[in-house]
């Protein structure tokens, strides 16, 4: 592995599970356009997450990461974003109480559009087409037009990620993440017949919140009870897209992939001499290995 790294040095390595774009000029024009777009996240946010993950590794905090296997363009709706965020918050409250430590909340959201496949192509009724590899690459319908990798999908993925992040920031900082509100959601949940085993812990949390309220500790007096830090993550699979969103941080002078706070390499692409490891070794984001 060469010591010299750049955002495109991965191109000198073997890149598995990458789509075959028919129109390279169209692809390059699209990537050049994306490279001029604003960052989806900020380097300082990625540094904050790395610091918090250090606390996790030292046993002083707990990591909660969740979200869809793959996001889709068709299911893009504010209600779906809200519900994913809401479930993660509900889980975090219970974990915070049970573990008596901070919970680092990371969503598999706002960028999880690509899917590695065991086979590059799919055959139905003697027709062989490219396998569906996620909405950022191609469509799920089995026809030539949908299955051909389309560079325009990269821009749609960027725009959907930007909209999702905008809503997540509003939810996390605008009062939706208020601790009492989250606890009320949990109280409503435990009323169900299948949730009886959670009622005891919900009752104990309720007592703690009532005590805090009596002491004047609430969302109005303590910021941490009214908002929360929330980070995004996805698999760094489509390296052309990740390269286009890799920038030098003006504060530190280091490279960050500003498509997400945290990136990970999948089980199928973590070869030490492969393109994905080559790309990820040069960025300062927190990195996961599946």
Residue ranges and their predicted role:
Residues 76-86, 90-290:
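Active-site-facing alpha/beta catalytic cores
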Residues 39-45, 54-55, 59-61, 69, ...:
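Dynamic "connector" segments at or just before major functional cores
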Residues 2-62:
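N-terminal basic/disordered segments at the start of proteins
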Residues 36, 56-85:
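N-terminal ordered "arm"
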Residues 28-35, 70-75, 255-260:
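A generic short-segment signal for beta-strand/edge and adjacent turn/coil regions
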């Amino acid at each position: 592995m060469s010591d010299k790294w750049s955002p495109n040095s991965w191109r000198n390595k073997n890149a598995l599970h990458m789509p075959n774009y028919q129109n390279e000029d169209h692809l390059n024009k699209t990537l050049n356009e994306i490279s001029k777009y604003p960052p989806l996240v900020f380097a300082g946010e990625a540094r904050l997450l790395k610091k918090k993950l250090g606390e996790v590794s030292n046993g002083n905090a707990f990591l909660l990461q969740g979200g869809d296997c793959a996001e889709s363009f068709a299911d893009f709706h504010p209600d779906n974003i809200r519900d994913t965020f809401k479930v993660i918050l509900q889980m975090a409250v219970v974990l915070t109480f049970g573990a008596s430590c901070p919970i680092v909340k990371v969503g598999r959201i706002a960028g999880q559009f690509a899917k590695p496949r065991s086979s590059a192509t799919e055959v139905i009724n003697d027709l062989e087409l490219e396998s569906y590899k996620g909405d950022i690459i191609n469509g799920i319908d089995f026809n030539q037009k949908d299955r051909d990798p389309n560079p325009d999908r990269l821009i749609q993925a960027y725009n959907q990620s930007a909209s999702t992040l905008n809503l997540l920031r509003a939810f996390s900082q605008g009062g939706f993440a208020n601790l009492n509100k989250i606890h009320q959601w949990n109280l409503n949940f435990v009323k169900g017949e299948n949730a009886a085993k959670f009622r005891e812990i919900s009752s104990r949390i309720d007592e703690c919140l009532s005590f805090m309220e009596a002491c004047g500790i609430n969302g109005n007096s303590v910021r941490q009870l009214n908002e929360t830090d929330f980070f995004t993550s996805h698999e760094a699979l489509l390296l052309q897209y990740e390269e286009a969103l890799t920038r030098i941080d003006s504060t530190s002078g280091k490279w960050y992939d500003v498509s997400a706070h945290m990136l990970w390499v999948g089980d199928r692409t973590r070869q030490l001499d492969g393109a994905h490891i080559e790309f990820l070794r040069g960025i300062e984001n927190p990195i996961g290995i599946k």
